[in-house]
UniProtKB/Swiss-Prot annotation:
It catalyses: okaramine A + 2-oxoglutarate + AH2 + O2 = 12-deshydroxyl okaramine E + succinate + A + CO2 + H2O; 12-deshydroxyl okaramine E + 2-oxoglutarate + O2 = okaramine E + succinate + CO2; okaramine A + 2-oxoglutarate + O2 = okaramine E + succinate + CO2. Homodimer. It comes from the Eukaryota. Belongs to the PhyH family. Its EC number is 1.14.20.-. SUPFAM superfamilies: Clavaminate synthase-like. Gene3D superfamilies: q2cbj1_9rhob like domain. Iron/alpha-ketoglutarate-dependent dioxygenase; part of the gene cluster that mediates the biosynthesis of okaramine B, a prenylated indole alkaloid that possesses an unusual octacyclic ring system, including a four-membered azetidine ring and an eight-membered azocine ring, and that exhibits insecticidal activity against silkworm larvae. Within the pathway, okaE forms the unusual 2-dimethyl-3-methyl-azetidine ring to yield 12-deshydroxyl okaramine E from okaramine A. OkaE also catalyzes the hydroxylation of 12-deshydroxyl okaramine E to produce okaramine E. Keywords: Dioxygenase, Iron, Metal-binding, Oxidoreductase. The gene is okaE. Pfam families: PhyH. Disruption phenotype: Abolishes the production of okaramine B and leads to the accumulation of okaramines A and H. This is Iron/alpha-ketoglutarate-dependent dioxygenase okaE.
Amino acid sequence: MTLTENVMKPQIQRFTRDHDPKVLWQVVEEDGAVIIEGFLPHEVIQKFDCELDVRSKATKGGEMNQEFYQMPVPTTTKWMNDLTATCPTFRHEILNNDILHSLCNVAFEPHGDYWLLNGMAMEMMPGNPTQQIHNDHGTHPILQYLRPDAPAPVFSIITAVTEFTESNGATRVILGSHRWPQGQKAKDDQAVRAALQPGDALVMHRSTKHGGAAHDADNQDHRRLLLTCMGTCQLAPYETNVTVPRPIVESMTPLAQKMIGWRSTRPVISNVTGLNTVRMKHLENQIELKSNVPLNVGGC
């Protein structure tokens, strides 16, 4: 796809981070995607990128846990999970981001409380191949049986840690594909690119077709992103955080603790018992969980 062909198509709408979250979510529901410029402040992205430098050095490309399913993965991609335990910026600043929660409050109003289903960093290196176009609800197959007009139970956010350009594989997005009938095949020429600056975020409906593009071998940039999947608390997280050391959890805010499953949640009525409880009581009270306790851990 050439740049000229890309420009001739309707593009992903862009808004600044101070825009009304109700409008932002309305665009997601109508178009399937929206770009929020400055979703994460520059200083937050800088610190997070610094922490990922450490993770990246200890991570080999092409290594992905395949205990559940065997599939080929490119050696030019690194996957970095367990961000709550290993990245202070993720647990203290990203999980408390005001724009994130404003958007979640709008999106999940029909469902009640929400939490983090997945938080994962990725790094794509020169020569990384084109990613197959897909949507992000494959982790929870039950979602495919929802009515098309059902309130959104989940959405995805791709935040640029480094710049996204055409030559380093900026994400391809097919606007309107979230309204397609099940089984409709995507074509590459239907996609537009999500060019992003560090800190910009691409917010997508759960059914929107998208995929990374090829990273030119002669472009020596390493493209990094943060993929966060937010969902109603009625869905089990893709990645559990029960293994995060308690002192780390207790250094976090109550809101961030709820995001990683260390507090009970409250869906809307008809649920009258809460979820993630102990003997029908609040988890955090039963385990005497503290919060905002300083943790003596060095940053980067």
